[in-house]
Curated annotation (Swiss-Prot):
Entry GO CC: plasma membrane
Keyword terms: Cell membrane, Lipoprotein, Membrane, Palmitate, Signal, Virulence
Residues where lipid is bound covalently (N-palmitoyl cysteine): 25
Subcellular location: Cell membrane
Protein name: Immunodominant protein p72
């Protein structure tokens, strides 16, 4: 066999010899390997023919290393050992298809490119009902209030997703689309049609889903809430206090309930104010007149359920009055008593009551009113000795204009009005209803001798009714001179005092806003005195 091989090698061309060498080496390599031996360098002076194998030695495998750079250009081509390079079975001129193909992870997905695969499929698996029961801030709020809070600060929504749906929270940007037809239901304690927008962080695609938010405080309406309506009822017939003017009752109601709120309205001089009227005053009313305080007046106006009084309490918040039509309105706030746990969740209610049978100011017949004004003869005589009246009297006498009334329109008329106002006195005599009664003479201007009825700041009164009188209330001043039977000259003064009759809407009466449709009680005053 060895001799045949040598003979064949001497005949075949070099290219064939190379192929046979590969076969020969590969066969030997499979039987025995000696990686530790180094290849011997061939002698460059010998003919370039295959050397005879040394039968006394094992074949040297290192001769097959394709990386041996010391082999000459005429040396036979040595193929790599297939056992050392698994890819040597591939043809050298054909690329390795397995290596050049894109890996499965890098290859574009068919569903992504064709938009056939739903990237939001995981959103279909989450519950579309989100509970806020673990957040005490929201469990204490009704749905309407909670919705307003979430529109201002939706961070709690994101907190819920970060805890209950962490995978979704990490995968998507979540956005609350506020003011987008969401609907709050206080009775059920939920918010419906809440729209959340989910934007995929990788693909930058979005999807909007509707959710229901639950866990908010429910408005529970129980039958006991309606009992506030039954707690206070209007008396069918109000007695005793209806002979008084409604403005007086309204002011005393509010003042008696809270003195501090109305003390700044009172004048501190010698006047009639709240303190003179509260709890009755025999110098201003008849002895049988009712006490004027909040408890007594409420008892005259209302009927109270004593059992419900254990659960509720009331407070007067506003009053309205119309002294011309005899109308009194009272607005009450009814709330729960603090000490009763059974009613702590019940809402406060307001009730309005209107009473239309109170006393009216009669602007046509002053005899039916308790208020009258007068100027004493002595004061008028004193006024004629100086100022405008003295000048006018001299003019009338010198021109012999007797029994002819002259309207005073001099530029000094304001000073005369101030004199008249300061000297006017007040008489309270109630012939019609017999309830108002002043045991002493009163005045308009404040002084040490007489107590003024204008006991509220700004020239206002509350007794016998709420009105305002000042020097400008005095109008149409006439002066005339006559002679009596004894040929004594007399000066006669006539003037009118316009007293407004107020009506108001519901208010706390701390200001003097009126309806604007004012009526006037006009009092005509005449006085005569002899002159020199």
């Amino acid at each position: 066999m060895k001799k045949a091989t040598k003979l064949l090698l001497s005949i075949l061309p070099i290219s064939s010899i190379s192929f046979l060498s590969v076969v020969s080496c590969s066969t030997r390599n499979s039987n025995a390997k000696q990686p530790d031996k180094k290849p011997e360098k061939p002698n460059e002076n010998t003919p370039k023919t295959p050397s005879k194998p040394d039968e006394s030695k094992q074949p040297d495998n290192n001769n097959t290393n394709p990386g041996d750079s010391n082999n000459g250009s005429n040396n036979p081509e040595i193929k790599p050992d297939p056992s050392e390079n698994p890819q040597s079975d591939q043809p050298m001129d054909k690329p390795d298809e397995k290596i050049d193909k894109p890996s499965h992870s890098d290859k574009p997905q068919a569903d992504d490119s064709n938009n056939n695969r739903d990237i939001f499929s995981d959103l279909d698996k989450i519950s579309k009902e989100i509970s806020f029961e673990t957040f005490s801030f929201y469990t204490q709020r009704d749905a309407v209030t909670a919705l307003v809070d979430l529109q201002k600060d939706p961070s709690t929504i994101y907190t819920i997703f970060s805890k209950d749906y962490k995978t979704i929270f990490d995968k998507y940007h979540i956005q609350f689309l506020a003011n987008n037809e969401e609907s709050a239901n206080n009775e059920k304690g939920l918010i419906e049609k809440v729209k959340l927008k989910f934007t995929h962080k990788k693909f930058d695609q979005s999807k909007i889903l509707d959710f229901i938010f639950t866990g908010f405080k429910k408005n529970e309406y129980t039958s006991i809430t309606n009992n506030k309506e039954k707690y206070i009822t209007k008396r069918e017939k109000v007695e005793k206090i209806t002979d008084l003017f409604p403005s007086l009752i309204g002011y005393v109601l509010l003042y008696s309930q809270d003195h501090n709120q109305y003390k700044n309205l009172m004048e501190a001089k010698n006047v009639i104010n709240f303190e003179d009227l509260e709890n009755g005053n025999s110098s201003l009313f008849i002895d049988k007149a009712p006490l004027l305080n909040v408890a007594t007046i409420k008892d005259y106006l209302f009927e109270f359920n004593p059992e419900l009084g254990k659960l509720y309490k009331e407070k007067i918040t506003a009053v309205k009055y119309d002294d011309y039509n005899g109308i009194l309105g009272v607005k009450l706030e009814i709330e729960n008593r603090d000490f009763d746990p059974k009613t702590t969740k019940e809402p406060i209610i307001e009730k309005e009551f209107v009473f239309d049978n109170f006393r009216k100011v009669n602007i046509k017949d002053n005899e039916k009113n308790p208020l009258s004004l007068f100027l004493t003869q002595d004061k008028f005589k004193e006024m004629t000795k100086s100022g405008l009246l003295k000048t006018k009297i001299q003019e009338l006498r010198s021109s012999n204009k007797l029994e002819k009334k002259e309207l005073l329109q001099d530029k000094k008329i304001d000073f005369l009005k101030q004199q008249i106002f300061k000297n006017l006195l007040v008489d309270i005599n109630d012939n019609s209803h017999n309830i108002y009664r002043s045991q002493s003479t009163l005045s308009l201007g404040s002084n040490k001798t007489y107590k003024s009825i204008l006991g509220l700041a700004g020239g206002f009164s509350i007794y016998p009714f709420h009105t305002s009188i000042n020097k400008d209330s005095i109008k149409n001043i006439y002066l005339s001179i006559n002679k009596d039977e004894e040929n004594v000259h007399k000066a006669i003064i006539e003037f009118e005092v316009y007293i407004p009759v107020f009506s108001t809407g519901f208010s706390d009466l701390k200001s003097y806003a009126t309806s604007g449709d004012e009526k006037y009680l006009v009092l005509k005053i005449v006085q005569t005195t002899s002159i020199q």
